[in-house]
Design a protein with these regions (language model features):
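Inter-helical turn/loop segments and adjacent helix faces that build the functional surface
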Residues: 165-170, 193-197
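Active-site-proximal helix-loop-helix substrate-binding element of RNase H-like nuclease domains
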Residues: 6-7, 14-169, 187
Length: 226
């Protein structure tokens, strides 16, 4: 997350309409060099303001990845910026759904299931893959990346409409709201800064264990057999 960026982003208001636009990525010039995004900082500030003020519900597919990146890139100044982290968690997790979690609860069985967006929206969006799993989006032509990003957003709406009724019909809504969604906050925080640790208590326990280790070692070394 600290070495990532926000290449492009998409917002869709239903499964047929949306917009995608560049943030940090502007494509490459004729020599193959990255074109600098001169207005990236302005767009980032606008995105942050949008997320802070928007009162509607946002839907993601794999929120544990998307929001994890967005919090670090839009709200944190550095890896130890706890204030920015907590503010970002409050803002980004105010009202949301995750179609990956919904799909899991709607399709989970002993036979297994696939939770990736493309598999679950294939009948709607077809095969829009850009080939192998994307490792570096800056190697993709900007127009193609924007198109790909937009189809992702539209497909997320489709998957929500497809599986949310099934999740509710199967009496999984309470599990979704009371177990899965609360866990996401802890998961994202741990992804950003590691597992929360009570440092004073950790130091206290470490000192106790170190003392006990030394005591037992001396006891072993003092044994005549040794």
């Amino acid at each position: 997350h600290h070495s990532s960026g926000i290449a492009t982003i998409t917002f869709c208001w239903n499964k047929h309409n949306g917009i995608a636009f560049p943030v940090d990525y502007r494509g490459r010039d004729a020599e193959g060099e990255l074109i600098p995004g001169m207005d990236a900082a302005i767009i980032r500030e606008a995105l942050r303001e949008f997320f802070e003020t928007y009162q509607g519900r946002l839907t993601y597919h794999s929120i544990a990845f998307d929001v994890y990146i967005l919090i670090y890139q839009l709200f944190m100044q550095h890896i130890l910026d706890t204030e920015g982290l907590l503010h970002g968690l409050e803002v980004m997790l105010r009202s949301w759904d995750c179609t990956k979690l919904i799909a899991y609860l709607a399709t989970n069985s002993c036979a297994g299931n696939r939770l990736d967006l493309k598999s679950n929206s294939h009948e709607f969006s077809g095969n829009y893959s850009l080939g192998e799993e994307i490792k570096d989006v800056t190697q993709i032509e900007l127009f193609r990346l924007l198109e790909y990003n937009l189809i992702d957003g539209l497909s997320t709406w489709f998957v929500k409409e497809k599986y949310e009724p099934i999740m509710i019909q199967d009496n999984q809504l309470q599990i979704y709201e009371e177990i899965f969604k609360p866990a996401i906050k802890d998961i994202i925080q741990m992804q950003l800064t590691g597992m929360p640790v009570n440092m004073p208590r950790s130091i206290e326990v470490n000192n106790h264990l170190t003392t006990e280790q030394e005591r037992l070692l001396q006891k072993i070394l003092a044994d005549p057999i040794i």
